[in-house]
């Protein structure tokens, strides 16, 4: 899972926006089952053809895996069809639980008042809150809107950095060396509320 799409710029074969920065992780073990089922359910929902639906049981291997490390990985799916904002709630939860630091990387920053409140409140209580956004935009209008959020966040202690070598398409977060996320959800309305996406959260303790 991660931000990669199947296009040349994602692998720096072409360079329309400078150096393209993205992230992805390879999943192994039981967590893959959950992600496979979520993908197939969304595939079926989008296809809307009963006769061509993919049966999850056909693609999921029923095999027990021995954990290699402590902690857990929790895949989850977000969808505009169920009225729940799982992606945003996970980000807000991380900001609320963070004690030392909470860092985000996102290509677009267009957030709700609730997300803004969580980030600024964390910064006010002494948490090191940082956000990395692209220094070179792929969409100029969205880039302008992204920058319009800087002032209020910085005013309340959130640190914002722009990755200047090119376009940063990564969507990741990490907090206190205990919580981390990597997936396809940006910190923006469209991604948080209107995408059918897969995401994963990893807690080390």
Residue locations for each model-derived region?
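Charged, low-complexity intrinsically disordered terminal segments
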Residues: 1-201, 205
């Amino acid at each position: 899972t991660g931000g990669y799409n199947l296009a040349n710029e994602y692998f720096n074969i072409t360079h329309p926006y400078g150096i393209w920065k993205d992230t992805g992780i390879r999943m192994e073990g039981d967590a893959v089952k959950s992600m496979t089922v979520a993908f197939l359910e969304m595939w079926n929902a989008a296809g809307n053809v009963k006769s061509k639906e993919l049966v999850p049981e056909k693609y999921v291997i029923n095999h027990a895996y021995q954990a290699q490390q402590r902690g857990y990985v929790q895949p989850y799916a977000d969808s505009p069809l169920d009225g729940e904002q799982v992606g945003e709630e996970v980000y807000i939860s991380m900001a609320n639980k963070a004690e030392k630091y909470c860092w985000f990387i996102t290509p677009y920053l267009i957030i709700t008042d609730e997300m803004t409140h969580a980030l600024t409140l964390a910064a006010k209580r002494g948490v090191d809150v940082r956000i990395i956004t692209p220094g070179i935009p792929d969409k100029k209008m969205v880039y302008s809107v992204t920058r319009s959020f800087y002032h209020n966040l910085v005013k309340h202690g959130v640190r914002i950095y722009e990755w200047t070598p090119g376009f940063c398409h990564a969507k990741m977060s990490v907090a206190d060396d205990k919580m981390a996320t990597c997936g396809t959800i940006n910190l923006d309305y469209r991604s948080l509320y209107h995408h059918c996406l897969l995401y994963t959260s990893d807690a080390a303790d």
